Amino acid sequence: MSAIAVTARDDRIEGAVYLVLYMLCIPAANWMIGNVGTFCVPNGGPCMVPVAPGLMAPSGVLTVGLALVLRDLVQRRLGRWWSLAAIAVGAALSALLAAPSLVIASTAAFLLSELADFAVYTPLQQRRFILAVIASSAVGLVVDSMLFLWLAFGSLDFLVGQIVGKAWMVVVSLPFIWWLRERDARRAESFVAARG
């Protein structure tokens, strides 16, 4: 088996891992909103977690921040249509764990932010991978937060906390994104050297 075939197979396996993690982030975030937090807002409001001093957000925020990065990795390894399939599977799993209003709100928010991600990440990823992840996540987290909060709770009261919490997860992921870019560059260089 050639080195190129091995790398392609490894990329698909790596992509499958990202895909499974991404699919699981969606129901995990929805479940957390109703069950995990330092306190829960009465009368069906979300459970909240601190994301900065004096700033709270619905508890699924950190998981969604991770999902924003994972979907870029799914697209990089498997293609953008796999990320849409992951949203569908994640929504179906969410229906088993969360209130219908959360499932509808999160599915709509993930889909719209995915379309925004396509517009930003897809054209940038080959030339500027780290910039693509940062830019698409920034756009996606704002779109996702606004639509989700409006559909799930009828207000944007938690918008700043949502944005900050998701941004933290993007920032935390950047060393891994940098490592991934460097590893991919080293592999590409070794293929060129082996062919030359």
Question: Where are the model-predicted features located?
Answer:
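Short, intrinsically disordered terminal tails adjacent to the first/last structured region
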Residues: 1-6, 190-196
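N-terminal membrane topogenic signal
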Residues: 3-21
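C-terminal ends of transmembrane helices
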Residues: 3-6, 67-77, 118-125, 177
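Helix-boundary and loop/linker segments of multi-pass membrane transporters
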Residues: 11-12, 79, 96, 125-126, ...
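The first (N-terminal) embedded transmembrane alpha-helix
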Residues: 16-33
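Membrane-embedded alpha-helical hairpins and interfacial helices in multi-pass inner-membrane proteins
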Residues: 103-195
